[in-house]
Amino acid sequence: MTDLSHIRNFSIIAHIDHGKSTIADRFIQICGGLSDREMEAQVLDSMDLERERGITIKAHSVTLNYKARDGKTYQLNFIDTPGHVDFTYEVSRSLAACEGALLVVDAAQGVEAQSVANCYTAIEQGLEVIPVLNKMDLPQAEPDRVAQEIEDIIGLDATEAVRCSAKSGLGMEDVLEELVRLVPPPTGDVGAPLQALIIDSWFDNYLGVVSLVRVVQGTLRLKDKIIAKTIGKSQLVDGLGVFTPKPLQLKELKAGEVGFVVAGIKDIHGAPVGDTITHAQTPDVEALAGFQKIKPQVYAGMFPVSSDDFESFREALAKLTLNDASLFYEPESSDALGFGFRCGFLGMLHMEIIQERLEREYDLDLITTAPTVVYEIETAKGETIFVDNPSKLPDPGSINEMREPIVEANILVPQEHLGNVITLCVEKRGVQKDLQFTGSQVAVRYELPMNEVVTDFFDRLKSVSRGFASLDYNFLRFQPAKLVRLDVLINGDKVDALALIVHRDKSQHMGRQLVEKMKDLIPRQMFDVAIQAAIGGQVVARSTVKALRKDVLAKCYGGDATRKKKLLEKQKAGKKRMKQVGNVEIPQAAFFAVLKIDS
């Protein structure tokens, strides 16, 4: 095995679409990790969803052997990281296992807010950051301008930055040479008691829990007895190895290496991410500093369409939580939708991804309510409570003060789109804190209510800036605000799953818009359906879905039986997506109407 001075652990920091996964592909090709026949684009993005959306969601790892120009062979452990703002937690975990990071910037587009945020995380964790200018093959590449931008915005000297094109393969070996030269080797003692950090875990139906670990001290061998510090239950190591990117079984993993461990753990919570693994005979080894547990920012109710799926839904969530430590869930029941779970997510993209993974990987049919953020409420008795579900909001009389979460949003935008972005932030009740011109870009800092950010802010920001603005935000504080609960009544019955918490100044406008939207989405019945929006006891908007006249002539006379069967099946599939609320069927689209309101 390689000695410590020849190991390099690194990850790549890049904004979405700046070519991170393609660089990974080139590294694998240069180092011969896969034969040309097995090579495919974005080989590390193994989830179908990742390929379809063209984003990296999960962190992946690869171990490659690179023969450098100095004639020595180096073991490169590369941990791939996602670039989207919702997955920053995955990034901080990957960085915790590295000594260096490549900051990849698109030579045509320049620096984006997300790379700035992740780059600061890397610098705070003491990593060596190496700037790389990618996409040099593009005619619109401006390396000198972008190098200056990296220096202005992040403060890294990028005059010597490697210039490469992952697509054409130009300059990729120079990137590897820089990596070997600049990233420090890991420190650690192979003979010390074992300490290994769990970077990621996932559930395999045959092997049980598989964990990706970075060995910090000591050596991990096959048939060793190991324990996870927080659980303390001893397990036998059945298999360990590295991904090249195919799994390669090894006899041992030494200090400084990154690889996977299988220890026959069948319990989903048997290997929590961020925990320390050590030998059963040295249980009092110091735990490694993991990463802070992240708090969900957005909550939504998820309910199985058929109540028979409740147990399989619970299992699916448990397996997903193992793989995605930032997902939170607790049981919840709704008068309208029955039993389900209240789930917490890092942002809207995270929520969509989780919903799609549940529906695809676990074959569940789900109804999701509109997402809300967490509010802090001081009751008349002086107690402080947190509410993440509008239907759990106490009676207005017993509330002393309501506070909403405020986020600090850092936006990078080209100068010509600055006006539109400022207009959007003001419309979303934002307060400008800072504005700096750096080259052709402007860095704006705003304080915005999180409630406004999580719904459609990201999409609107992209559309007003023609896709050029980038956003990074983090929670700042709770701030008092005039908030009210907007209830939706259908035929006089409150539908708890449709309630919203909104700002008082916007409540009437929101009520009217919501009612109009619902009117278009609720199918016509055999009777008039009244849709009302109310605040407390006061109705602020009303609309009526007119009754339908039954068409008695549209019956099939005789004809082919399979034709009738087809029509019945089609109707059955449509009914499945609906839920009976009192006596009106509400389609899934109506639950999401809330998101489409122009506040």
Curated annotation (Swiss-Prot):
Gene3D superfamilies: 3.30.70.240, Elongation factor 4, C-terminal domain (3.30.70.2570), Elongation Factor G (Translational Gtpase), domain 3 (3.30.70.870), P-loop containing nucleotide triphosphate hydrolases (3.40.50.300), Translation factors (2.40.30.10). GO terms for molecular function: GTP binding; GTPase activity; guanosine tetraphosphate binding; ribosome binding; translation elongation factor activity. GO terms for cellular component: plasma membrane. It is an enzyme of class 3 (hydrolase). Its EC number is 3.6.5.n1. Keywords: Cell inner membrane, Cell membrane, GTP-binding, Hydrolase, Membrane, Nucleotide-binding, Protein biosynthesis. SUPFAM superfamilies: EF-G C-terminal domain-like, P-loop containing nucleoside triphosphate hydrolases. Its main location: membrane. Pfam families: EFG_C (PF00679), GTP_EFTU (PF00009), LepA_C (PF06421). GO terms for biological process: positive regulation of translation. It catalyses: GTP + H2O = GDP + phosphate + H(+). It is found in: Cell inner membrane. The keyword Cell membrane applies. It is a peripheral membrane protein. It comes from the Bacteria. PANTHER family: TRANSLATION FACTOR GUF1 HOMOLOG, CHLOROPLASTIC, TRANSLATION FACTOR GUF1-RELATED. Belongs to the TRAFAC class translation factor GTPase superfamily. Classic translation factor GTPase family. LepA subfamily. Required for accurate and efficient protein synthesis under certain stress conditions. May act as a fidelity factor of the translation reaction, by catalyzing a one-codon backward translocation of tRNAs on improperly translocated ribosomes. Back-translocation proceeds from a post-translocation (POST) complex to a pre-translocation (PRE) complex, thus giving elongation factor G a second chance to translocate the tRNAs correctly. Binds to ribosomes in a GTP-dependent manner. This is Elongation factor 4. It comes from Cellvibrio japonicus (strain Ueda107). The gene is lepA.
